[in-house]
């Protein structure tokens, strides 16, 4: 018997199962397929040829063997393996079809994109080039990146390991997986009950037959009954082990789903304000470690040429000169009155200085007065010269 086709299918199921499902698959291949193909064929090859009855009545021996074994043990176990593996094979076909469809849809979406770019952050250099202060600008801005480069980076990063349950859920195969698991469990229970009613737990060394055309009750003898009994008990144990693995896998899926839901709720409670504000990729932000400072209006992020920068600088200088020229033309009309008030304040200050010096040095009033007079004259001449030039600066 060739098992290569079924074995290849079951190996493909190994890639779309949980770790409990992988254990079940190992038990199915090693203990069921190998034991049935190797041990069963060698043990039960002579079950009918060595079935001997103590009668010479034609046809009596065949009728008695049919009563002893309505279905051959090996054929029963082969039929059991095929039916138990059928739900898994159907699940595999559905999974391959759905995954291929999803990949095809993703490929179409990527091909339909007119601008296959992704966002990444880069330091803004346009403003720095115009300032010419040789200082780094901490502000960061998004830059477009090719989607292929992003995919290469994602492929280079190792994927987190898991037991297969999350992969099944992400692919949308959880319902089909649970359905095939239930069908597999039902088949296991059905074949376990059928094996008990057909063969029991022991292969007896002889069998009493009274069917027609046997003239009376006759005794029939079975070859190697002890060996066949041991093999029968082994197959009972393998069936029970597969049934326990199915139950364990269902519990694993149930508790794993509950644990994931509880963890997601706990993360939401721990970080309630994670999504309370709108997020946009176009908003500039500073990297960690930089102090936020108010900056002038940002120049639009473009690679400005030297000609454009020079043109903008000349335009700004011209506007500044025009602004300062207009300020000089709009001097106040009462400039002379302001100068008179300044001279009067200067005279009062001189008188106060003379009085103070007269009190402290009464012997030299003339010398002080002469010095003060010369100083006042020089100040007046300076003020008159400044007013004549039309400047607003006044020397005191």
Curated annotation (Swiss-Prot):
Keywords for this protein: Cell junction, Cell membrane, Gap junction, Membrane, Transmembrane, Transmembrane helix
Topology feature Cytoplasmic, residues: 1-22, 96-175, 249-396
One Gene Ontology CC term in the entry: intercalated disc
Coiled coil location: none
Topology within the bilayer: Multi-pass membrane protein
Gene Ontology biological process terms in this record: atrial cardiac muscle cell action potential; AV node cell to bundle of His cell communication by electrical coupling; cardiac muscle tissue development; cell development; cell-cell junction assembly; cell-cell signaling; chemical synaptic transmission; gap junction assembly
Spans traversing the lipid bilayer: 23-45, 76-95, 176-198, 229-248
Biased composition, class Basic and acidic residues, residue ranges: 147-156
Keyword Membrane: yes
GO molecular function annotation: gap junction channel activity; gap junction channel activity involved in AV node cell-bundle of His cell electrical coupling; gap junction channel activity involved in SA node cell-atrial cardiac muscle cell electrical coupling; monoatomic ion channel activity
Entry's localization field: Cell membrane; Cell junction, Gap junction
A Pfam family per the record: Connexin
Segments in the Extracellular topological domain: 46-75, 199-228
Highest rank taxon of the organism: Eukaryota
Disordered: region residues: 145-165, 353-396
Location, primary (coarse class): membrane
Bias-annotated ranges (Polar residues): 376-387
Subunit: A connexon is composed of a hexamer of connexins. Interacts with CNST.
The family this protein is said to belong to: Belongs to the connexin family. Gamma-type subfamily.
PANTHER family to which the protein is assigned, alphabetical: CONNEXIN (PTHR11984), GAP JUNCTION GAMMA-1 PROTEIN (PTHR11984:SF6)
Cited function: One gap junction consists of a cluster of closely packed pairs of transmembrane channels, the connexons, through which materials of low MW diffuse from one cell to a neighboring cell.
Protein name: Gap junction gamma-1 protein
Gene: GJC1
């Amino acid at each position: 018997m060739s098992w290569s086709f079924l074995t290849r299918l079951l190996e493909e199921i190994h890639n779309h199962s949980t770790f409990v499902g992988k254990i079940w698959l190992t038990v199915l291949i090693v203990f069921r397929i190998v034991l049935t193909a190797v041990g069963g064929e060698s043990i039960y090859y002579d079950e009918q040829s060595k079935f001997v009855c103590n009668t010479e009545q034609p046809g009596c021996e065949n009728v008695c063997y049919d009563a002893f074994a309505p279905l051959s043990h090996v054929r029963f176990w082969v039929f059991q393996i095929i039916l138990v593996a059928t739900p898994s094979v159907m699940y595999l076909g559905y999974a391959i079809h759905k995954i291929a469809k999803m990949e095809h849809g993703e490929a179409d979406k990527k091909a339909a994109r007119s601008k296959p770019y992704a966002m990444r952050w880069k330091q803004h250099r346009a403003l720095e080039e115009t300032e010419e202060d040789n200082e780094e600008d901490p502000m960061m801005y998004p830059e477009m990146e090719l989607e292929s480069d992003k995919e290469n980076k994602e492929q280079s990063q190792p994927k987190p390991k898991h037991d297969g349950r999350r992969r099944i859920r992400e692919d949308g195969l959880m319902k089909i997986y649970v359905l095939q698991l239930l069908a597999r469990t039902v088949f296991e229970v059905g074949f376990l009950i059928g094996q008990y009613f057909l063969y029991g737990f022991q292969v007896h060394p002889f069998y009493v037959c009274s069917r027609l055309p046997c003239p009376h009750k006759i005794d029939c003898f079975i070859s190697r009954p002890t060996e066949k009994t041991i093999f029968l008990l082994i197959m009972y144990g393998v069936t029970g082990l597969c049934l326990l693995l199915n139950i364990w896998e269902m519990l694993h899926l149930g508790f794993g789903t509950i644990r994931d839901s509880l963890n997601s709720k706990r993360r939401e409670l721990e970080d309630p304000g994670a999504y309370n504000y709108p997020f946009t990729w176009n908003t500039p932000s500073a990297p960690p470690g930089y102090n936020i400072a108010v900056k002038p209006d940002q120049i639009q992020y473009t690679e400005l040429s030297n000609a454009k920068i020079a043109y903008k600088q000349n335009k700004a200088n011209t506007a500044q000169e025009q602004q300062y020229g207009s300020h000089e033309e709009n001097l106040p009309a009462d400039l002379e009155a302001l100068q008179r008030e300044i001279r009067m304040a200067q005279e009062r200050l001189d008188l106060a200085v003379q009085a103070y010096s007269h009190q402290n040095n009464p012997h030299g009033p003339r010398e002080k007065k002469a010095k003060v007079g010369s100083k006042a004259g020089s100040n007046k001449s300076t003020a008159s010269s400044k007013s004549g030039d039309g400047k607003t600066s006044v020397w005191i």
